[in-house]
Design a protein with these regions (language model features):
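Phosphate-binding site recognition
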Residues: 1-192
């Protein structure tokens, strides 16, 4: 256990995203996550299980505390404030619902002026408003909903900005596709 205390919290290597996470598809939510992190000390990712909340967060996180990892749980139990304070920011707190008290520790650090927390897990929807006054991050976090992959995301067809594409002569986005009813049904089924 003493050796575990010397273990650094998971750090993301300083390599390009395509090298670190080659399987990751571009997501519409990525620019929104970056923007929310600039504006709020905490961003809570919400969405169905398997929607890609953790994968999305790992694209911007510099460190990670994963409550599905027993070592991270033990380290958190020993020194929650130190672990959260010293983690490189932004830090992903993954599977927070396993340890809901972690939100109270984050609240106290935010109240001390610290930010850069991404909270993800599969725990239903918690709204940071006055109707949920027991929610510790009321007024301190932003909720970013992460839907399942869209058809465009599944096929890596995220468009470039329209004006940029038009100036470059790229009209590929305007090419019609012939789909019958089973094709449309297949798209609908694959995107939730």
């Amino acid at each position: 256990m003493a050796d575990d205390l010397a273990r650094p919290v998971f750090r993301v290597p300083d390599a390009p995203l395509k090298d670190r996470l080659p399987h990751v598809r571009p997501r519409y939510a990525l620019p929104a996550l970056r923007q929310h992190l600039e504006m709020f000390p905490v961003v809570m990712l919400q969405g169905p299980r398997g929607a890609g909340k953790t994968t999305l967060a790992q694209q911007v996180a510099k460190s990670k505390i994963d409550f599905s990892n027993r070592t991270d749980v033990e380290l958190f139990e020993i020194n929650p404030k130190g672990l959260l304070e010293n983690a490189a920011k932004p830090v992903l707190i993954d599977e927070w619902q396993i340890n809901p008290s972690s939100l109270w520790h984050i609240k106290h650090l935010v109240d001390e002026g610290l930010g850069g927390f991404i909270v993800a897990g599969s725990a239903g929807h918690y709204e940071p408003d006055s109707a949920h006054s027991r929610f510790p991050l009321v007024g301190r976090c932003s909720i970013l909903r992460v839907p399942v992959l869209s058809w465009a995301e599944q096929n890596a067809l995220l468009p470039q900005p329209l004006a940029e594409g038009l100036l470059a002569g790229d009209m590929s986005w305007a090419q019609p596709q012939e789909l019958d009813h089973t094709g449309y049904l297949a798209i609908a089924m694959s995107t939730g």
